[in-house]
A protein has these predicted regions:
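Active-site PLP attachment segment
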Residues: 75, 305-340, 355
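Short glycine-rich anion-binding loops that position phosphate/pyrophosphate groups of nucleotides
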Residues: 124, 255-259, 320, 455
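Conserved core of the PLP fold type I
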Residues: 138-143, 148-281, 292-293, 298-309, ...
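Helix-loop "lid/cap" segments that line or gate small-molecule binding pockets
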Residues: 167, 330, 358-365
Length: 475
């Protein structure tokens, strides 16, 4: 059974919740996230997950049944209609172009404030962050720049020059990224960068090759641009390159630490992707997720550092390394796209908070950033080892592939297990452990994605003890 990929309902909207739910499911079907024959969650599960009445869910499903998008099967559930035929050249079959109609909020998960629930993926431990040092950097930035940081800064659409220079130096030293500082554009996290790139590079019906399973929010950003997502298989060497005859406009990959499987893209695959992009005039978006968090051998070179044709766009964020509410990321934009990219960003925001940018520039320049990364790498490596040891001792029915870094571990369940059911059971017990199928377009082996980095050893031990009691039931 497929999930609804974290459908989000806007309670401040004038559109009814029933209408939003029906429209959201319809768009998931039209975009290919839900395929003909896929089973949908029950109306009870939808109502519980989205905090709406069951009548709202029932009425939305009934409407989609009447429109031919869904079909109920007696005693089995509700399925995407097997008779639906979608045009291969269109993702959103609306009467108007996507740019001419208001965009519905993408179906993203809204997380509660506060400490993360046990095993929530991709969460740093904020208790390790040197808050006193950060506050000194903020104070120093205000002392140096004065009230100028409190005003609009017209030339700073691409980011504070001091921060862009320090980010460029950091990327050159740590990842071999080849760029001038003016190619570094500061964004409010990697997601804004992906959304801007999708808007700039993709048109209706263009094909985007993405990892499957992979990062859902990236896929949604591409689909909202009108592009057609082509799922690419992931194996022990990472993303399989597109076939020689395949034509795609853009390839999206997380090569350092593929999300959610945790594998690294092999050097041969990196070179094959670059060769494909050069031969076909395609773009590669390299989301260098988790590249700093490697606990064994040093990371392989970034794709951008291997590219000689300027077809790789490098994307990153500081929120995973420092703290999640720091909404500062970056895109290293090829010269040929720079003016258009900055112009598009200007339509979204004049600039991001300048005090935080100035503080981060000083944090990088002072060396405090690198000290923090070393501290995190040591703590997270110990936690990964402890987590795996506790899991082995508990004899869980989960298979964990070898991992030498990252913030998460993906445990594979027996082939006949329903990982969505297990994820819901764990959620009911207070855990946040997404199903591997949540990140997949096509059927995949069932699994569960565990985050471990945000939790100190005593918390991990207690959480694994609770987890053991929940999983005592036979899988």
């Amino acid at each position: 059974m497929r999930t609804l990929a974290g459908l989000w309902l806007d309670r401040a909207s004038r559109t009814t919740l029933q209408e939003q739910l029906a429209r959201g499911v319809k768009e998931l079907i039209q975009s290919g996230v839900l395929a003909p024959g896929d089973e949908l969650p029950s109306t009870r599960d939808v109502a519980t997950g989205l905090h709406v009445s069951r009548n709202t869910a029932v009425n939305a499903y009934d409407r989609l049944v009447s429109e031919g998008f869904l079909e109920p099967v007696s005693r089995s559930g509700v399925f995407v209609s097997s008779s639906i035929t979608l045009s291969p050249h269109s993702t959103w079959p609306a009467p108007r172009a996507p740019r001419a109609r208001p965009a519905a909020p993408p179906p993203l998960v809204r997380e509660p404030l506060g400490s993360p629930a046990p095993f929530r993926p991709s969460q740093p431990d904020v208790s390790l962050f040197p808050l006193l040092v950060w506050n000194r950097m903020r104070s120093r930035a205000l002392k140096i720049e004065g009230r100028s940081l409190l005003h609009y800064q017209a030339p700073c659409v691409a980011g504070l020059p001091a921060l862009r220079q320090n980010v460029a130096a950091y990327l050159r030293d740590s990842r071999g990224v080849r760029c001038d500082w003016h190619q570094v554009v500061i964004t409010s996290g990697s997601q804004q960068g992906l959304f801007l790139l999708a808007s700039l590079l993709l048109g209706r019906g263009e094909r985007v090759y993405v990892e499957d399973p992979g990062y859902v929010e990236a896929r949604l950003a591409f689909q909202r641009s009108g592009a057609r997502v082509v799922p690419g298989p992931v194996d022990e060497q990472g993303l399989c390159p597109p076939a020689r005859g395949a034509k795609v406009s853009l390839v999206y990959t997380t090569p350092s630490r593929q999300f959610p499987t945790g594998v690294s893209l092999s050097l041969a695959r990196r070179l094959a992707l670059i060769d494909y992009a050069g031969r076909n005039g395609a773009w590669i978006v390299e989301d260098d997720y988790d590249s700093e968090l490697r606990y064994g051998a040093p990371p392989l070179p970034s794709l951008q550092s291997l590219d000689g044709s300027g077809r790789v766009i490098y994307v990153g964020t500081f929120s995973k390394l420092l703290f999640p509410s720091l909404r500062l990321g970056y895109v290293v934009v090829p010269e040929s796209l720079l003016e258009s990219f900055v112009g598009l960003k200007h339509l979204m925001d004049d600039h991001l908070p300048l005090v935080d940018q100035a503080a981060l520039a000083l944090f990088l320049e002072s060396g405090a950033f690198y000290s923090h990364i070393r501290r995190c790498r040591k703590a997270y490596a110990e936690r990964q080892g402890l987590f795996l040891k506790l899991l082995r001792e508990a004899d869980f029915p989960l298979e964990f592939p070898v991992a030498d870094g990252g913030m998460n571990l993906t445990g594979l369940l027996p082939a006949k297990a329903d990982d969505a059911v297990w994820s819901r059971r764990l959620a009911a017990a207070g855990f946040d452990v997404p199903a591997l199928s949540r990140y997949a377009v096509r059927p995949t082996r069932p699994g569960l994605v565990f985050g471990f980095t945000a939790f100190a050893p005593p918390v991990l031990r207690a959480a694994v003890g609770r987890l053991r009691r929940v999983l005592e039931t036979r899988v």
